[in-house]
């Protein structure tokens, strides 16, 4: 008997996105091996009947609405890399890499969230994702569609490449892009040193949430702030910059770093995004691909080994799969950077600039989310949509506190003009970048917070992280992006109250589920026959 569960699942207003969650999974089996003597030729009779392999039930993990596969005693996934790490920490040894775990171990490692530890919810598809992989169990309709597209054994896995999942959802008409797009607003910070700035930004988002306004920041963190001064020689910067050198200093004491890591974890757990701002904040406009690869390797080492390097206890709330985006220090890019971003697992880059009405395109395999070239409201000067550029324009990057209120007003009105033009125009995403610095007596932070409070609660406005924008963009075809760029959609402003209410979706409990031979870190290759001209 089907058990119906209800949960809140965020969809864009006016039914803009349709996801076929009202699906049930049909019976499936583990792969069976038939011995060679029973498969000699088609003309010979098989002299031994192979018993039908067992089927597995899909059981609720917790009260958040996700499932796992079980035979009543053992759990057959889904398992993430983070869960495997926890299992190993608990002394599980080789059992952590088995195709099945005890239900007790599985549920403990899964965590208390809707998605298994180490993954996050993609609100466009409704599936949890770990890096570039979506996590099942998947409904029979999608499994059948995958098989019909010659997906082979990959279709029976509980881990699909997200590109594959998007293509299947589109082909089966289970997901549909909105005719009128939301107005995305992206607010991000570069830096990560100041504990005061971490607390101030996080607390501001909480204050808005109490008012019914959703806002999530993206934090582009610099890895040197997670290396103590005494460990600085661990870093040998690319392009001959020298060992132990940094353009922005270091992380201070181990205690300083412990507190900073706590802020990173809290921000991530509160729904903000953590992304990469490289390591030493050097301008890489002349760096080779090898230089950038070296820099990214240092970033991973200093961030994900931060506790070990600095003699601390604890662990990050996410692993390398959680780092999906990049912004180059000083926006210094080179051809070598764009050749390596996709290879390093990044989904998007925010290091370029473009016109304010630009709809993102993929370049070199990653989404291009550029800052905007905009005109200031009071001084009518051209400036990038980033606080430092206002600071330089206003006072040549030197403090002038006596004019702080005027600078704040100019910045706020400029941001509002940027918003109004896009909101009433083609709704291209807004990109605004700030730093963990209170230049000109905090004028730019004040302007940013005033702006966020003014727009994030408006109808059809989504103040989200960059990875959430990437989730939305992954759903679109080039034709749909071109239509958005032209503004070829109804200019409808929804009612504010209807926009803020979550849509209630009914999900049917799957009776049985697919079980693959591999769990954990299995990686899948997208099925080429499913590309259908969609973006790579």
Would you name each region that the model predicts?
Residues 26-27:
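C-terminal motif of bacterial Sec signal peptides marking the signal peptidase cleavage site
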Residues 159-168, 209-212, 218, 348-360, ...:
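C-terminal domain-boundary segment and adjacent tail
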Residues 159-273, 302, 306-339, 355-356, ...:
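Active-site beta->alpha N-cap acidic-glycine motif
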Residues 238-247, 251-252, 312-426, 477-485, ...:
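Active-site-adjacent pocket scaffolds in enzyme catalytic domains
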Residues 277, 341, 369, 432, ...:
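Conserved, mostly hydrophobic/aromatic
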Residues 1-11:
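N-terminal secretory signal peptides that target proteins for export/translocation
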Residues 32-50:
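Short, low-complexity, disordered segments immediately C-terminal to signal peptides
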Residues 52-160:
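Extracellular/cell-surface secretome signature
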């Amino acid at each position: 008997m089907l058990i119906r569960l209800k949960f809140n699942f965020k969809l864009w207003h006016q039914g803009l996105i349709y996801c076929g969650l009202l699906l049930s999974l049909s019976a499936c089996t583990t792969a069976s091996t038939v011995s060679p003597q029973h498969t000699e030729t088609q003309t010979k009779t098989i002299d031994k009947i192979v018993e039908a392999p067992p089927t597995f039930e899909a059981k609720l993990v917790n009260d958040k609405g996700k499932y796992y596969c079980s035979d009543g005693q053992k759990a057959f996934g889904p398992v993430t890399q983070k869960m495997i790490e926890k299992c190993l920490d608990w002394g599980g040894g080789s059992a952590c890499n088995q195709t099945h775990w005890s239900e007790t171990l599985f549920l403990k490692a899964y965590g208390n969230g809707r998605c298994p530890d180490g993954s996050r919810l993609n609100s466009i598809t409704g599936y949890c994702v770990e890096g570039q992989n979506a996590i099942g169990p998947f409904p029979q309709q999608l499994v059948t569609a995958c098989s019909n597209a010659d997906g082979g054994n990959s279709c029976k896995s509980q881990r699909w490449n997200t590109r594959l999942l998007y293509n299947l959802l589109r082909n089966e008409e289970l997901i549909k892009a909105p005719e009128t797009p939301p107005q995305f607003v992206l607010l991000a910070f570069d830096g990560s040193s100041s504990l005061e700035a971490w607390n101030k930004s996080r607390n501001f988002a909480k204050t808005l949430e109490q008012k019914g306004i959703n806002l999530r920041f993206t934090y582009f963190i610099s890895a040197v702030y997670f290396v103590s001064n005494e460990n600085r020689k661990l870093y040998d910067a690319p392009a001959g910059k020298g060992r132990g050198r940094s353009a922005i200093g270091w992380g201070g004491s181990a205690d300083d770093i412990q507190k900073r890591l706590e802020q990173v974890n809290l921000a991530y757990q509160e729904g903000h995004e953590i992304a990469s701002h490289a390591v030493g904040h050097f301008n890489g406009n002349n760096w080779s691909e090898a230089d950038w690869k070296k820099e990214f390797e240092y970033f991973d080492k200093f961030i994900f080994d931060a506790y070990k390097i600095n003699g601390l206890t604890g662990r990050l709330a996410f692993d390398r799969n959680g780092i999906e985006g990049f912004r180059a220090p000083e926006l210094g890019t080179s051809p070598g950077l764009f050749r390596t971003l996709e290879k390093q697992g990044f989904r998007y880059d925010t290091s370029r600039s473009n016109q304010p009405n630009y709809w993102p395109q993929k370049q070199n395999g990653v989404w291009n989310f550029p800052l905007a070239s905009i005109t200031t409201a009071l001084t009518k000067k051209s400036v990038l949509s980033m606080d430092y550029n206002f600071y330089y324009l206003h006072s040549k990057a030197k403090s002038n506190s006596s004019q702080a209120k005027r600078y704040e007003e100019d910045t706020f009105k400029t941001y509002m003009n940027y918003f109004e033009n896009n909101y009433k125009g083609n709704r291209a995403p807004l990109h605004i970048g700030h730093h963990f610095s209170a230049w000109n007596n905090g004028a730019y932070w004040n302007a940013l917070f005033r702006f966020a409070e003014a727009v994030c609660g408006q109808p059809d406005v989504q103040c989200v992280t960059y990875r959430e924008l990437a989730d939305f963009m992954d759903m679109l075809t080039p034709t749909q992006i071109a239509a958005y760029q032209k503004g070829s959609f109804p200019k409808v402003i929804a009612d504010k109250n209807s926009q803020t209410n979550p849509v209630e979706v009914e999900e049917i409990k799957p009776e049985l589920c697919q079980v693959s031979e591999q769990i954990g870190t299995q990686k899948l290759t997208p099925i080429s026959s499913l590309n259908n001209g969609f973006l790579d």
